[in-house]
Amino acid sequence: MASKRRNMSCSERHQKLVDENYCKKLHVQALKNINSQIRNRMVQNENDNRVERKQFLRLLQNEQFELDMEEAIQKAEENKRLKELLLKQEEKLAMELAKLKHESLKDEKMRQQVRENSIELRELEKKLKAAYMNKERAAQIAEKDAIKYEQMKRDAEIAKTMMEEHKRIIKEENAAEDKRNKVKAQYYLDLEKQLEEQEKKKQEAYEQLLKEKLMIDEIVRKIYEEDRLEKQQKLEKMNAMRRYIEEFQKEQALWRKKKREEMEEENRKIIEFANMQQQREEDRMAKVQENEEKRLQLQNALTQKLEEMLRQREDLEQVQQELYQEEQAEIYKRKLKEEAEKKLRKQKEMKQDFEEQMALKELVLQAAKEEEENFRKTMLAKFAEDDRIELMNAQKQRMKQLEHRRAVEKLIEERRQQFLADKQQELEEWQLQQRRQGFINAIIEEERLKLLKEHATNLLGYLPKGVFKKEDDIDLLGEEFRKVYQQRSEICEDK
């Protein structure tokens, strides 16, 4: 504020100087105007007033020169003063900055010392380090589980690929088998067709034979009718022909029987082939069903193994969480017990210190009283000895004793005042120590909150108990952190 006021004063002085210069310039301008008017008049009266004009012009020039010199001197002085003022302000600003920097370094050094010597901050740092270790351990466990899961996933994919490859091979084999069956069926169809054509040809040959027989019968009849005379010869010939026909019929019957047996054998083979194909199809279906059952069993085994591994991992995590909670609860109980013992011990020490201080105070007061009494007696005796009270009359003796008593009381009062001053100084030193301790406690609290703000968000879910001293610590870290922390706390309580 003072610097601002000084800056305003400097600005006002500068403005005042500018105004003065402006007035001087106006004055100079007025003089110049007058000079111009005079010059005009002198032009009119040049012949009459030439000498006076030269003198007046010289006077004006001298005055103008003096004004210019004065203005230049004032400007130089003002600039010098402004430079000195600016230099002083810069020096003062540099001193203030150095002081602020020194105070900042001093405060930082004190905070560093407090951080190094504070048991609470060291405990908090240990807890945060433990939380980071827990987080790292959880990350390693999660990474191992992820690797196991990826391995199981790869195994499942490999098994799935093998099953698909097996299915594809079975499908290709079935397709090849179907193709072979179709080829065989087509072959048997072609064979049956050929047999039918052969049978048809045989039937045509038989019909042709019958036609020839009819023709022969017709010829025989004609011969019988035309030549009865040669009946005997032709009859023999006819008998021979009949025998030939009978033999031909017998051979044809044998051929038909043979063909029928061949057809029956062929049909039997076809039936056997069909039965064999049916048996193969049944075997193939049984093999496919068996492979499908094996695949389902393998898939179920993999699923059960995966579920078992997941269940074991969950059980392991639950056991680890329970062990961690039990360990943290044990640490918290032990810490509470230690804090209670420490508090009780501190109370006992404070009580003992108070009793010792009271006893010491009593001793000091008693000693002070005894010392005052001894001092009073000594001083009275000394004064009595010095003034030889026995040589004085009673009135002077009483006056002298009263004077001695007053002097002794004055000395006692001075000693009492000195004692009170010493106690007041001790009280002030104790209050100063308390204020210093309060400042240190404030620094510890600030550093504790700073550590929490810096690390608590990254360690959410891994912070041990006892990190937060009060509910306000959680609220300082933000609404989102508080909600997630409460949810995790509820989950841990439910477990």
UniProtKB/Swiss-Prot annotation:
Region (Interaction with BBOF1): 1-314
InterPro entries associated with the record: MNS1 (IPR026504), TPH_dom (IPR043597)
Coiled-coil segments: 59-410
Residue numbers of Phosphotyrosine PTMs: 188
Swiss-Prot/TrEMBL keywords: Cell projection, Cilium, Coiled coil, Cytoplasm, Cytoskeleton, Flagellum, Meiosis, Nucleus, Phosphoprotein
Main location: nucleus
GO biological process, one term: cilium organization
GO cellular component annotations of the record: axonemal A tubule inner sheath; axonemal microtubule; axoneme; nucleus; sperm flagellum
Subcellular location: Nucleus; Cytoplasm, Cytoskeleton, Cilium axoneme; Cytoplasm, Cytoskeleton, Flagellum axoneme
Highest taxon, organism lineage: Eukaryota
Oligomeric and partner information: Able to form oligomers. Microtubule inner protein component of sperm flagellar doublet microtubules. Interacts with ODAD1. Interacts with BBOF1.
Function noted in UniProt: Microtubule inner protein (MIP) part of the dynein-decorated doublet microtubules (DMTs) in cilia axoneme, which is required for motile cilia beating. May play a role in the control of meiotic division and germ cell differentiation through regulation of pairing and recombination during meiosis. Required for sperm flagella assembly. May play a role in the assembly and function of the outer dynein arm-docking complex (ODA-DC). ODA-DC mediates outer dynein arms (ODA) binding onto the axonemal doublet microtubules.
Protein family (similarity comment): Belongs to the MNS1 family.
Name of the featured protein: Meiosis-specific nuclear structural protein 1
Organism the protein comes from: Macaca fascicularis
